[in-house]
Amino acid sequence: MSNELLASYDTFPYQSHPFRQSHPDRLATIGHLFGMTPPSVETARVLEIGCAAGGNLLPMAESLPNAEFVGVDLSPRQVEEGRDDVRKLGLANVRLVAMDITDFPADLGAFDYIVAHGVYSWV
C-alpha cells in the first residue's frame, strides 16, 4: 500500500461510534435464529477489523468484562487515540493494533465473533 494512501487514513479519520447491530449479543441471537449454537458472548473473543479509535469496540468491552476484544486498523493515529481511551477507561480486555489486515498475524489467534462494519462503511 502506498504511503499516500496510508496517510489518508490519518488525514480523514473515520468517525468511530457504537454500532449496536454488531454487538456479540445481537450476532449470537441471529445465530440462534438460524439454528446455530453460537459461542458464549460473556467469554467470547471478538475481532473488529477497521476499528478506528475503538468507538464501537470499547462499549462492547465495557459491557462484557470477561470477553476479549481485539481491534485492528490501518491508521496508527486512530489506534493510538483508542489506546488512550482504553487506558482512561481502565479496560483490561481490549487490544488495539495498527496494521494492514492483509498482514494479519496468526498469533492473534481464533475469534468467536468478527465485525467489519467500519471497513464497509468507509469504502
Language-model regions: role of each:
Residues 42-52:
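Conserved class I S-adenosyl-L-methionine
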